[in-house]
Amino acid sequence: MANNVYAYSEIFDSIQGEGEYTGYPTAWLRFYLCNLQCNGFSQDDPTDPSTYKLPYKDFDLIEVNRLEELPVWEYGCDSSYSWSKKFKHLQHRLTSREIADNIRKAFTNEHNKGKWLNRHMCFTGGEPLMKHAQLCTMEVMQHYLNDDDYPKFITYETNGTQMPRPEFIEFWKNYPGELMISCSPKLFTVAGETTKRAIRPEVVARYMEFADRGYLKFVVTGEKRAWEELDVTIEKFREAGVDWPIWIMPSGATVEGQQVHDGDVAKMAFQRGYNVSARVHTYLWGNLIGV
């Protein structure tokens, strides 16, 4: 275990800005690599790749030495730096012990001497349920258990397409804390990912075997076709036995992008009885990486 080295994009301390844990002090580990790209986000027509604007592809990295120096792009995935090969050289590679120690250092300050207390732990990406990330998170959490100081509240922010490994399921069944799965399936009319690739109710149903809690969080625009696809997609999850609550988040990686239709989308959501999530961290600190 000690010799395994894992690639990750970021470790930072902030709050959770989305979903059920919004506002909670949260330690973050963002993994590198994802099986989806979601280049359709914020595009004029997410279903037509020929019309995409993807500024991350043309961005000049010659003077960039750290991921934190990158902008948050208006179009496409807001964390393309955590999966695109273009940014591979900027990723960090450490053992799980080193990662665990760096997470603890991230929330150590004059008010907290490095104890978990009630701090929330969030694994994100990229995709934090890819094989290497499942292995890494088990090792990291085992280090904390061995230290006898471990997070009591944990979330995986996943796209819901990665099957859990048997040892991963067993680990979380026995973990002495609450595991939340924040599952964000990607809609074709919003993210540009095909239903075949992005919507896997049978996979999410497996998450229910070991997660204490969970919810489905969909990024949606104000377009009628997006809501029609949402209705069909939710029904697929319900048919698979996934009865988790529904959260709706207006599309837009930046504050400016969200303000285009966030109020309209929120109203469409609560009128249907769905929960509404904003990206609170962007309203607090702007369009930055590491918050």
Task: Specify the residue positions occupied by each region the protein language model found.
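N-terminal [4Fe-4S]-dependent radical SAM core
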Residues: 1-95, 109-115, 282, 287-290
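Conserved acidic residues
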Residues: 11-14, 127, 159
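A secondary-structure boundary/capping signal
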Residues: 30, 124-125
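Glycine-/small-residue-rich active-site loops that bind phosphorylated ligands and cofactors
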Residues: 84, 128-129
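Conserved AdoMet/S-adenosylmethionine-binding subsite of the radical SAM
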Residues: 100, 104, 108-120, 129-291
